[in-house]
Amino acid sequence: MSLFHLILVALIQGITEFLPVSSSGHLILLPALTGLEDQGQVIDVAVHVGTLGAVVLYFWRDVRDGLAGLPRALTGRLDTPGARLAMGLIVATIPTVLAGAALHFTGLSDALRSITVIGWTMLLFGLLLWWADRTGAQVKEATDWSLRDALILGLWQAVALIPGTSRSGITITGARAMGYTRSDGARISMLMSIPTIIASGVLLGADVAVTSDAQAARDGAIAAAFAFVSALLALSLMMRLLRSVSFTPYVIYRLALGLVLLGIAYS
């Protein structure tokens, strides 16, 4: 795998992981449209580690509070904001873990990796994001996040296992439909990504430890570094823009890319 290809994969993952445009969809499209080889599990795990580091650093106060409240959450004592956050993230992650394991072990995840599927999901879920952002009230904040809302958003998040859906896009859509502000809906979505990325990395990396070599480890370190920097920049820019800009630019991008992909798929 060339250095150019390595950096390209890392940048695509880093930039698109937290934007509502589907990182997995873009990574599937890269070899399909360019003829480049698939990056493999080592690089997949590495870029996940990089993006995980970015979101943890950006939301480090929330992460600190959640970790501090985790012991209380595990014993059912939801009497602090940190404990409620930790329990909310646990509840929100369960549907995705169960659905992801089912798709992985049945082989259905591979069947969904096609340009046609990505094209349709880009279009359909882009329109759904536009509808939710246009019609959803902005009356709820992150402090209003309940276990009921966590479960609902967890079910939305499980849908993102279909390539092209976008994990951040579908959870932000759900949050906006439930009346969360753009900034707080995105904040909840980003925090939900942390246990999800960890679970995904564990699943992808099950065999990496015994199959990787020194070269693979070096490639992984490079990929993780570039993914970390690009993800942190993209996340910072998006959260800043959401103070004054809607999700319409991302919707337009999704619709344009979806139409191009369907044109390729059906030509």
Curated annotation (Swiss-Prot):
Domain of life of the native organism: Bacteria
Catalytic class of the enzyme: hydrolase
Membrane topology qualifier: Multi-pass membrane protein
Keyword entries, A-Z: Antibiotic resistance, Cell inner membrane, Cell membrane, Cell shape, Cell wall biogenesis/degradation, Hydrolase, Membrane, Peptidoglycan synthesis, Transmembrane, Transmembrane helix
UniProt keyword annotation of Cytoplasm present: no
HAMAP family: Undec_diphosphatase
UniProt-recorded name of the protein: Undecaprenyl-diphosphatase
Lineage summary: Bacteria, Pseudomonadati, Pseudomonadota, Alphaproteobacteria, Rhodobacterales
